[in-house]
């Protein structure tokens, strides 16, 4: 790990947290992922060996704890790791407000999008009985064009293969459109009205889709307005 050669606490924190992928791994831990495979779903373009290296470094730095047996480790945030939560949230909110660029194809990832949605959609919006929502992304890579979110008894499951249940709602759109909705670049209902998103199913369910889907937590935070400022007596 390269050093900035500075005693400044910011520089020392950056030496640890600003290595490629490190802060994204911390984001996944803050979001609730505790197992290697679950963390990997949030960083699908990160190699397993690099993820292992970053987790090892975070353990050595005291940011996370590793427990369990080899091959079945559980990772949890330490006190130091938990204190990163507001930092990560503000970093993401700042990114939503100031670092957003137009989405390019390289930025689009159906697996990451659906995994993020799976842990954020609000199951309380739908009845407690099983509700199956199918997502179709015709322009996504082969093998990532169809996804199913199954809402039942307050739980959400994500399936890449047909779960074999009756589908209640079908949502069909370009991957970029749903990504824009998820990151609050446009509203779901507005995209439906424009014809960018096609929705099929019971109107009692489709009318609630915008509330059910919600949006990226970091984008929601960034959309709230001006971020808090810390007192820094610069002259």
Regions found by a protein language model. Name each.
Residues 37-38, 45-235:
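Feature captures hydrophobic
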Residues 7-8, 172:
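A generic alpha-helix surface/boundary motif
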């Amino acid at each position: 790990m390269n050093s900035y050669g500075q005693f400044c606490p910011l520089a020392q924190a950056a030496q640890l947290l600003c290595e490629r992928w490190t802060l994204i791994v911390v984001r996944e831990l803050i979001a609730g992922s505790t197992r290697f495979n679950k963390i990997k779903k949030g960083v699908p373009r990160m190699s397993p060996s690099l993820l292992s290296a970053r987790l090892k470094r975070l353990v050595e730095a005291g940011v996370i704890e590793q427990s369990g047996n080899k091959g079945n480790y559980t990772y949890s945030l330490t006190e130091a790791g938990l204190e990163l939560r507001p930092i990560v949230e503000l970093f993401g909110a700042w990114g939503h407000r100031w670092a957003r660029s137009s989405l390019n194809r390289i930025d689009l990832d159906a697996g990451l999008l659906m995994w993020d949605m799976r842990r954020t959609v609000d199951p309380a919006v739908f009845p407690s009985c099983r509700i199956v929502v199918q997502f179709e992304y015709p322009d996504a890579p082969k093998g990532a064009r169809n996804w199913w979110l199954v809402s039942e008894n307050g739980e959400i499951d994500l399936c890449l293969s047909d779960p074999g249940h009756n589908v209640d709602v079908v949502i069909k759109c370009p991957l970029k459109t749903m990504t824009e909705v998820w990151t609050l670049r446009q509203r779901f209902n507005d995209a439906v009205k424009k014809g960018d998103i096609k929705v099929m199913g019971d109107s009692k369910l489709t009318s609630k889709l915008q509330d059910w889907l919600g949006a990226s937590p970091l984008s929601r935070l960034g959309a709230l307005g001006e971020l808090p400022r810390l007192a820094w007596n610069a002259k």
